[in-house]
Design a protein with these regions (language model features):
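Active-site neighborhood of HAD-like aspartate-dependent phosphohydrolases
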Residues: 1-50
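C-terminal cap/substrate-recognition subdomain and adjoining C-terminal extension
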Residues: 1-3, 76, 83-150
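Acidic/polar active-site rim loop that often engages polyanionic ligands
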Residues: 20, 58-59, 141-146
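Short coil/turn segments at secondary-structure boundaries
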Residues: 37-41, 57, 92
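Glycine-/proline-rich flexible loop or hinge segments
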Residues: 43-44, 56-60, 77-82
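Helix-loop "lid/cap" segments that line or gate small-molecule binding pockets
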Residues: 45-50, 57-67
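Hydrophobic alpha-helical segments typical of transmembrane helices
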Residues: 61-62, 73, 118
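Acidic catalytic patch
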Residues: 67-77
Length: 150
């Protein structure tokens, strides 16, 4: 029997730091994203700092390398990112709390502004039931369109 729902943020709550830059750097190292994407991301970040209301444009620029990539392929990349790179950033206290709440019958939901391209793999690495995150659009062909948060 469900005893309620608990909501958690991801970046700086369940894991140390912001996750989008480590994901981009992982994709560059694995040759999924070109190195020039880092320059594009830096420019997008500066633009976002100057105009915070344009966060979706900054994310679109940062993640534009996804355009045309298969959602299934990127799910495999997301799994590898968490497994190979990001698990050490998970806060042990946060994981302990998740397990405690789960044992009490709570449903656990992570709500994050981070993109779903990698956040959708998170339930495989944490005891959570769902993730609500920034949507990266996938077309009818199962490939990313390059649109983020639209």
């Amino acid at each position: 029997m469900t005893q309620g729902i608990a909501f958690f943020d991801f970046d700086d709550t369940l894991a140390r730091g912001d996750s989008i830059l480590p994901f981009l750097l992982y994709c560059i190292r694995k040759r999924i994203s070109p190195r020039r994407q880092l320059v594009k991301a830096a420019g997008a970040f500066l633009y976002w700092k100057l105009r915070p209301s344009r966060a979706s444009r900054a994310k679109s620029a940062t993640l534009s390398f996804l355009k045309g990539r298969s959602a299934d392929e990127m799910l495999d990349v997301a799994r590898a990112f968490f497994r190979d790179e990001y698990l050490p950033r998970f806060y042990q206290d946060g994981l302990t709390e998740l397990w405690s709440l789960r044992s009490q019958g709570m449903k656990l939901v992570v709500v994050s502004a981070s993109p779903d391209v990698y956040m959708r793999a998170l339930p495989e690495f944490m005891p959570i039931d769902a993730v609500l995150s920034t949507r990266c659009e996938v077309g009818g062909d199962g490939r990313y369109t390059g649109q983020v948060g639209e």
